[in-house]
Amino acid sequence: MEEKRIVKPWQAGLMLLVGTWMASGTVPVMIYYGMKVLTPGLFLPVVCILCTLMSTMAGTSWGTLATVGVACMGVAQGLGVPLPAAAGAVCTGAFFGDKVSPLPDSPVITATVCEVPLMDGIRHALISTGPAYLISLVFCFVYGLRYSGGSVGGEVYEDILSTVSAEFWLSPVLLLPVLVAVVLILMKKPTIPTFIAGIAAGAVMAMLCQGVSLHDILTVMYSGFSADTGSDVVNSMLNRGGFTSMLSTIGLLIAAGIFGAPLRKAGVVDVLLAFVERIAKTTRSMSLGVLILHAVFFTITGAYYVSYPVVGGMVKDLYPEYHLDRKNLMRAMLDTGTGLAPMVSWSTTGSYTATTLGVSNLAFAPFAPMLWLSIVFSVIYAVTGIGTAKAKEN
């Protein structure tokens, strides 16, 4: 994959979507109704399932975090659910879809690099991701039980509801931008037109329903939504988005793309590959070595857009030599790339996740077991040989 394609237009446009949906009242109305309908005890599993559906249908974990994820974090704050736990539920759902949906880049890139049919590779990835996801969903239910006896109300709860209702005109009509985006997703329209339509719908609703001028809409798109509501809690929930909030993440994306080529030229990857070949005395040691190799290389570069083609391209021929199907490599890279990414704070995905949800990577990682349990399952499968697909005889 060429480094010049590392930064994609839709990634830069996500925070424009967040800004316009804040100004239009779309996210505030989702927070308002979410606090009215959801209970603290059921909040975490419901959030996990919602983000799973959104990510699987939309084919983007980043888009899920920026839309449903942002709204859910606001609801969590209002219901008194710890923000790290809420972020963990959001990430579990968002990155499950990113690993097992045929729409995101991650499965498509890994399937292409490994030269395996996309759906075959996804089904094989479910061997590790599926159990890890189910355990995470059960964890959400069990952890949420400690809040099931709590009453909905209190000073913060009432402060959020009253402030949001005072600052915005609230109506189900404000959910129109969400409806537009969901319909286009279900129609399998390309990502960029879908986000443009969502941004445009949000801008129109902001002008018609909230009285925001076109000049202010453009300002929100560039520097984010900013309002002094008189409530510090509500300000922290709503004041976000805008192109400038993505600059640090875009910088990391560019740096990762630039960093990948020198690593190849300097022979760093060759040294790591030589290490794998040296310890690869059996199929099990080879499989474990590849897991370690990709995890280390991804952690160094911080971008699986770089690690997938570089590492995958260099080790894919090892698998036929050991009579293993290359879809094992696809699963290994998804688990140590897409799964690991949100927990690595200096990675592009990790930086974006922490910035968007407002919770540090180390804080939410324990509440998103799927991210690291899938790696644990992959290691177990590599060591025991369980769940390892053999190469088909020609």
Please provide the spans of the model-predicted regions.
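Flexible hinge motifs at transmembrane-helix junctions and intramembrane kinks/re-entrant loops
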Residues: 176-220, 387-389
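Juxtamembrane and boundary regions of transmembrane helices in multi-pass small-molecule transporters
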Residues: 99-102, 110-162, 350-394
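Membrane-interfacial loop-to-helix junctions in multi-pass transporters
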Residues: 2-8, 33-49, 77-86, 167-173, ...
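Alpha-helical transmembrane segments of multi-pass membrane proteins
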Residues: 41-54, 80-96, 285-298, 322-343, ...
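Re-entrant/interfacial helical elements at transmembrane boundaries that shape
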Residues: 63-74, 91, 104-116, 304-318, ...
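Hydrophobic alpha-helical transmembrane segments of multi-pass integral membrane proteins
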Residues: 9-17, 40-71, 256, 272, ...
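Inter-helical loop and helix-membrane interface segments of multi-pass membrane transporters/permeases
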Residues: 28-42, 81-86, 144-169, 209-238, ...
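Core transmembrane alpha-helical segments of multi-pass membrane transporters/permeases
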Residues: 1-28, 41, 45, 217-268, ...
